[in-house]
Structure formats: C-alpha cells, structure tokens
Amino acid sequence: MLIACRTTILRTALVVGLLLTAWPGHAFDIQKVTSPSGITAWLIEDHSNPVIAMEMIFDAGAANDPTDKEGLANLLASTLDEGAGELSSTDFQSALSEKSISLYFRAGTDRFRGIVSTLTANSDTAFEMLRLALHQPRFEAAAVDRIRAQIMAKIRSDTQQPQSRAWRLWLQELFPSHPYGRPRDGTLESVARIDSDDLRRFAKAGLSRQGLSIGVVGDISAERLARVLDQVFADLPAQSSLPPVADQQPISDGQIRVIDQDIPQSVIVFGHAGIAWGDPDYFGAALLMQIVSGGFQSRLVQEVRVKRGLAYGISASLFPRDHSAMVIGSTATRNAKARETVEIIRAQWRKMAEQGPTASEITDAKSYLIGAFPLRFTDSPAIARSLAGFQHLGLGPDYPNQRAAMINRFTADDLKRIARRLFQEENLTFTILGRPQDIPTGSRAKSATQ
C-alpha cells in the first residue's frame, strides 16, 4: 500500500507539473543543454513542482536484431532494469519502488527508448540507477528466463489474435527479405535462442552516443542537467557497431492475399508506400490522411460505417519508418461484405487521387491537426518523450511553436498534387484474414472482382 501511495503521489505531481508547464496557446520554452563532454539534451525547466522526467532515444531497435535472434532488442528492453551493478533483480526493483522512481525501457522497430520519472528529492538515486542499468546490467539467468517466458506467452497470444496476425502477414508480404517484415517481439523459436551474452553484445553495440536524443522536463536546472548527462551517458560507446539497416521500398503491387481462418469476420489490412518524414510534402500527406480516415467525419468512416454499416471502425495512417515510408490501414467486416469493403477503400483512394480534397475538408483537417497537437502532452513524461522524439527527427527546438505554420502553408493546389502522389490505388495491397466470400483463399488477384 505504501508503494502504491507513493506511485500515486508521483503521478499526480507529474500531471500537475505538466499543467503549469505547457498548455494550448502557450509557447514552449525549450533550452538546448550541452554537457562538458558534448552530450545534448532539450530541457523544459519548471520548478513549480518537485518532479523530473527524462526520456532518451538510441538508434537501435528490432530492425537491428540478428536474423536468427529476432526479439533480441525487445528482450533487452525488458531485462535492462532487472538488476544492475551490485543490485539483484529483486533489490533493483525494490529500490525503485521505495523511492517512487519509474524506470523502464521500450524497443521499437527503429528506436530504443529509456524513460525515468522521479521526485526531485530522489533524483540522484534515479539517475544513478539509470546509469547502472545502461552500463552494468546483470542479465541474471533467472530474471532473463522469467521475462522470456512472459514474452513467449505474449507471442502465443498474439498468434491467436486475428488483427495482430493480419498485420504481421501484411508486413511479411511487403517486406519479405527485410527486417521490417519480421515480428518485433520475435518468434517462439528465436526468443528461445537468445542468451545473456546476446543481450550484452546488443547493449554494447547499440546503446551508444551516436544518434542519442534526450528530452527532460521539470525541476532541474540546465547546469545540473549538464552534469547528469555526463554522469549517465558520457561513458557509453561513441559509435554504434550494429550492422546498418538498408532502405527498402515496400513491395506493394496492388494484389489481394487471402489467408484462411475460420472466424466470423474478415480482418483487412491494406496499404502501400507512403511519404517519408522530412519530405516537404509530409504534412500535406498528414492532412490528406486526416480527411480520408482521421475521424468519424472522414471519408472512409462515412462510407464504410455510417452509410453502409460494414464495419465498426476503419482507419489508415502514415507510417514513416526510418528505412521505408508506408501508408497502412485496417478494418474488419463480415465475411460476406469483405469484397464490398475492399472496393469502397479502392474507390475512396481513387477519388482522392483524381479530385483531391474539398475546401471545407482542408479547413477542418488543418484545424484538427493544429488543435490536437497540445493534447498529446498529457503529463511530464509525455512532454519529455516528445522533446526526445523531435530532436531525433532532426527538428529544431522551435518546432512546437512553428508547427502550425508548417501545416497552414499547404494550399488546395498543393494538396491536389500530393494526393496524386500519395493515393496509389493501383498499388493498394491487401491482406485479408478470414473466409471472405467471392475472394478465394490464397487469392492474389489484382482486383476483388477478379
């Protein structure tokens, strides 16, 4: 109960700290802090509440997993905080709990994130424990086996979830020989092969200062943060030694692949190549995706759900990964209506490419993308996450204050041009899991009517 109470106090303080730091209509005052050894972080300094949140991003992720050890980055993220230095797994977790410190790691496809949140009074301990986790992880066999078992249980569960399976199969189809086509958590076989030495090698190779991005929010001065940066990160390797990941265009050939599964609904995943982050057209593409599938008033939701009742929900988004930009969407409908749903998606893709958006759609989409932006900053860790993410994308500290202008600059003619570029109906590639009527199992037809 004491631990739960302390955790509640920390969470409340983090949220209150946010409300006094940033809110819609107010500018972000971001400081760029550089340590004596040259490590850089972005800081929003706020002494109104005694809390600090830090997020760090390393240039490493599941895409860097060895071909026979898929799931390595994920297992590493799940075991880095399971004991470090002289502290066993139990002792390490107990120390975190006693000081109300939140410390954990997450492995994405291209990113490896670390997150720490702490009360100011316990921040010396928090940063030292972060340092230990990064530099002296124990990877005790018992702890690794326990976390491995949890991950394998999740893998088994995911294989029984039609939505997860359909997404995985779609990615395999578009990236048959690329890391993006592999499951991020790995397979039962690959996770079973990973040992503590594999974890140590990946940590040493991938957790480096190269590409390191750090965001910090809260009750800490720039001077103290500079010292903390060197304390925690200065002794990491200067360069990553992970093998590079190749850029790859998705093989989106406009075909439909049907995988038989005896379920009442057909789960549909669709998409093709997209527009990369950093492309001058990116925010224009984001506006168009908002119009097509961004909410209840979007074209796909209106056509698929509201007018025809074919599905409860349908969505599509830009997925600008580091080495391949994609558009990915999904829905689920009755097997008898899968063909109709596919044709509606194709028709909406074709309509946007040929006609572009209307003036009212553009106005509404701009209003939403600009107005919703501050809502992502739900607490201090969320702000720290955004600061690290913006930095990692190569944006400047003024990005939060310039973003609205970056969106508003797109004209109707710009968006019509981008629509012709983005919405490639002929390349729209589908994976359908289920028993859709009028689309044969194993079908690779160019159209659902064939």
Name each model feature, range by range.
Residues 2-13:
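Bacterial N-terminal signal peptides that target proteins for export
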Residues 22-24:
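N-terminal signal peptide c-region/cleavage motif recognized by signal peptidases
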Residues 26-50:
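N- or domain-start disorder-to-order transition segments that initiate the globular core
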Residues 30, 55-120, 183, 295-310:
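M16/MPP (pitrilysin/insulinase) zinc-metallopeptidase core fold and M16-derived inactive scaffolds
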Residues 34, 91-241, 258, 276, ...:
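Charge-rich, well-structured scaffold segments of protease-associated domains
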Residues 42-43, 50-53, 63-66, 440:
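Short, solvent-exposed loop/turn elements at domain surfaces
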Residues 46, 55-57, 241-297:
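His/Glu-based metal-binding/catalytic segments typifying zinc-dependent metallopeptidases
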Residues 52-56, 212, 265-268, 327, ...:
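Small-molecule pocket liners
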